[in-house]
């Protein structure tokens, strides 16, 4: 999947399946983590002079994003988030 413009594709990290006390959580009780890995970048934001801005992110970066960021897209049984670069809050090092 190749995003357009200033959009990026992020693969969300898997959520924990058990609690610290050993209780197995059903899918309905799991919170989706707001962390993931950037897998693809668009062409960059179009600037007023017609050029494209460089991304501050790179493919492979682990990122923290707003829990309401992006649109969920499923490709080949894998779930991805399609979001704007501005939705990313931080890079996890």
Swiss-Prot record:
| An annotated GO BP | chaperone cofactor-dependent protein refolding
One GO molecular-function entry: metal ion binding
Q: Which UniProt keywords apply?
A: Chaperone, Cytoplasm
Compartment(s) where it occurs, according to its Swiss-Prot or TrEMBL record: Cytoplasm
GO CC annotations, alphabetized: cytoplasm
Matches recorded under CDD domains = cpn10
Q: What is this protein called?
A: Co-chaperonin GroES 2
